A protein has these predicted regions:
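Short, structured segments at the rim of ligand-binding sites
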Residues: 1-361
């Protein structure tokens, strides 16, 4: 399907928009809900990842296909490793079968899990034979995708003696680890995160909880970009958000000040308003703690004629697609001068915008 987008004469906008729940929070809570009775969740994400995870958790099939859903693949690997007596094959799309899983599999094997590869070593599909995991200490590199670490954390309190995870080296995406721990704490799971060590105490049963998932800050990034690219006075109101968010992408509030966007909170509504035209010529950001918003920031910078250097993006190359390569390809069509490495992006300022271009999405 092709959609043609045309400019408008009046570029000042005022809108109210309801955003669905955070995918990151939703997926973590769904695993915890399956492990503990009495957890009721509202405002779940309507993302494909969350739908795939919900289906997998309710399925009795021997082969579970999670499509492109990387979070589901990682979280379910630990979940099914814990299900004593259950054997499943976890698989996914062609792209998913080229996304590494070995670091997580090795950590689970170190704890006593039984997992094997059905095809290529280190990649899905994987065969998991659920068993009682009795070991309670494991090491894993800190600079890997935080989803590996969160996957282990989510099952940790169900182990007989809990779990101690030692993170080796520099830790990537700490906000996502803290998000996992915060949600666990809300459910009564005791955790301690000091220096490079995370300790989780065992818990047989959580207290009954009604949890409202905060709306997704990553989704909010697109509306930040729209406001930044619009006339002064443009305003978008988004629901429902928390001023003290546990989502790393809430850093948008401070980042988009560079683009002339002011953020205010009114109850659970966040108000984005274009207050000034940005006079920035260059923007340099380390997005190690929030890499998923890099693409939106790059597009905003390009639209405003601002050069930018974005660092800490190494996890984007192993997503559902190589996001850095895809961004470079599509922005170049529009006239951007952009270069990428394994962990960074550099965009030169440019006032030229090519028209009548087809963008792959």
């Amino acid at each position: 399907m092709k959609i043609c987008i045309e400019g408008i004469e009046n570029n000042k906008i005022v809108k109210n928009i309801l955003i669905s729940g955070s995918k990151s929070e939703s997926n973590r809570l769904l695993i915890l809900q399956k492990l503990f009775d009495g957890i009721n969740i509202t405002n779940l994400s309507d993302s494909d990842d969350t739908h795939h995870l919900q289906h997998a958790l309710s399925s009795n099939e021997a082969i579970i296909n999670i499509g492109h859903a990387g979070t589901a693949m990682r979280f379910l690997t630990s979940y099914f490793a814990l299900k004593d007596g259950r054997e499943v094959i976890l698989t996914g799309s062609e792209r998913m079968q080229n996304r590494p899983i070995q670091i997580l599999v090795n950590a689970l094997r170190d704890l006593g899990a039984t997992i094997s590869y059905e095809a290529k070593e280190g990649y899905p599909p994987i065969r998991i034979k659920g068993t009682k995991i009795t070991k309670d200490k494991v090491q894993i590199n800190g600079n890997v995708s935080s989803q590996y670490i969160s996957s282990l954390l989510l099952i940790a309190s169900k182990l007989k003696n809990g779990l101690e995870i030692e993170l080796i080296g520099k830790i990537t995406s700490i906000p996502y680890i803290n998000m996992t721990l915060s949600l666990m704490n809300q459910l009564g799971i005791e955790t301690v995160f000091v220096n490079q060590i995370i300790k989780v105490k065992p818990l047989k049963q959580s207290k009954k909880q009604y949890v409202i998932v905060e709306s997704d800050w990553s989704s909010a990034s697109y509306f930040y970009s729209i406001v930044a690219l619009s006339e002064i006075g443009s305003e978008i109101r988004l629901s429902s958000y928390k001023k003290e968010s546990i989502q790393g992408d809430a850093i948008l509030v401070s980042i988009y000040k560079h683009f002339g966007v002011e953020t205010t909170f009114s109850g659970s509504t966040v108000v984005l308003k274009k207050v000034i035209q940005s006079n920035n010529k260059h923007l340099k950001l380390d997005l190690n703690k929030a890499p998923d918003i890099a693409q939106t920031i790059a597009v905003t910078s390009f639209g405003l004629g601002i050069s930018c250097e974005l660092l800490g993006l190494h996890t984007l190359k192993i997503k559902e697609t190589d996001r850095l390569e895809a961004l470079q390809k599509e922005l170049t069509k529009l006239g951007a001068h952009i270069s990428v490495t394994n962990n960074s992006l550099y965009l030169e300022s440019n006032s030229i915008l090519h028209a009548n271009i087809s963008i792959e999405t």
